[in-house]
């Protein structure tokens, strides 16, 4: 089993976010979403645009099957509002470029996070690093 580690400094989090933002808004938002919510990637990828309209968000965690409700982080909510402008409410938030309306895969999310972190000098990462 590979060991993954957290990103240990705020500066590195900002650097990785900026790196992703320059490349792709969806990928930058995926990173921010993981950092601010602490959710598992399988739960993050289930979000649709309509799930971002309210002050709160609720999910049934895939692994634990527990129903939970959370407040949006103000910074994340601001970025979400910019990102979802003119998007279809039924569209996946982290939509794949392949297919009509599919979320990106867990594998793709892993590749996005790992590549960005490695390019910014952070190693031993995975999607769980965001938690």
Model-inferred region functions:
Residues 2, 6-37, 41:
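Basic, Lys/Arg- and aromatic-enriched nucleic-acid-binding interface segment
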Residues 3-6, 70, 102:
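Helix-turn-helix-type domain boundary/helix-start signal
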Residues 10-13, 73-122:
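Active-site/catalytic core of tyrosine-dependent DNA strand-transfer enzymes
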Residues 18-23, 27, 89, 111-131:
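Short, basic (Lys/Arg/His-rich) helix/loop patches that form interaction surfaces
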Residues 37, 46-78:
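Conserved tyrosine-mediated DNA breakage-rejoining catalytic core shared by Y-recombinases
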Residues 63, 96-98, 131:
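Short, histidine-centered active-site or binding-site loop motifs used for metal coordination
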